Amino acid sequence: FMYIFIDAENSQWMMKFSMFILTVYLFFSVSRIVTYLFWLPTRKKKWMSSGIAAGSLLFIFFLYSALVTRTDYKVNELDMTFSNVPTGFDGYKIAFISDIHIGSMWNAENELKELSEIISDINPDLLVFGGDLVNIHHSELTPETLTLLSRIKGKDGSYAILGNHDTGAYINGSTPELRVKNIEMVRSKLENAGWLLLQDSTVYLKRGNDSIALTGMDYSDELLEYKHSLSSIRGYDVSKVYKTVPDNIFNITVSHLPQLWYSLCDGGYSDLTLSGHIHSMQFKLFSYSPAMLMYDEWSGLYEREKGKLYINDGIGSVGFFARVGANPEITVITLKRE
């Protein structure tokens, strides 16, 4: 509903206002419900006091998730072993981030500055971004934020794909022409920041005589139909994206939608798929999340015979200004040869 009144001119402040109102409403409503759940069974005063205490503690926890957890970056490091990783890429380090949602960051410059410093310390060979850089409109990419994005990089470059929010699909009155313009502006601004946008295209990374392929799935109008799909997308034709990619080369595919993994695996195209999109619904406690009830794959590492999938929990937030246990994530993957 919050997108109804959002257009190109008011996208940032209107989204932040809507998210703030929704966040306050959720915090107070849930805390109040907990208070009454304690009191209703017996309707005794002592249980009302216990309910007030429980509701207050819950409210404090929610407040912590908005003020602290939301920007408390977590670095997840993992080794991934493959039999077909070339010798030259044994030990190759990839920093993977996703879903920045710049337009709904409370203080984008401070948050991006901290992110750039963490990734600079990691000093990865490659920087990969999994889509949803902006929230509504390309105007969220200001000269200041682009300068900070230019500092987020890998030694072999920085590569990005589009997410559903980057397409302009959420602007009130969005048209195909408006979406094309928004995508072109996002691409142009990314290039100015030193990031290369992959749109159904592949680049080849080299180490001596060895090479691997990095493929980026574009977020086409056809995929927009699946932007809120809960089930895995099977039978989607991805073959055109890999027409010029050699069959025997180790391939990393970046797809904003993790639901595409089955189509990628069934075709034998991707050895490692990197995705975002779900954010663990910004609620994850002790590895449990509402997302696990809705999606086949929702966070972390998944494996099938034909490939692996890693879903990053994202950096920014959308809908409400909080990350309840679901810290913003920087994934550091080190490739290992079996």
Over which residues does each language-model region extend?
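Short, well-ordered helical secondary-structure segments
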Residues: A8, G51, G55, I60-L67, ...
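Non-catalytic terminal accessory segments
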Residues: F1-T71
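N-terminal signal-anchor transmembrane helix
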Residues: L40-A54, F59, Y64-S98, G103-I122
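Generic structural motif
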Residues: I33, R43, S83-V85, H165, ...
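Soluble catalytic domains of enzymes that build or remodel membrane lipids, polysaccharides, and related
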Residues: G88-E338
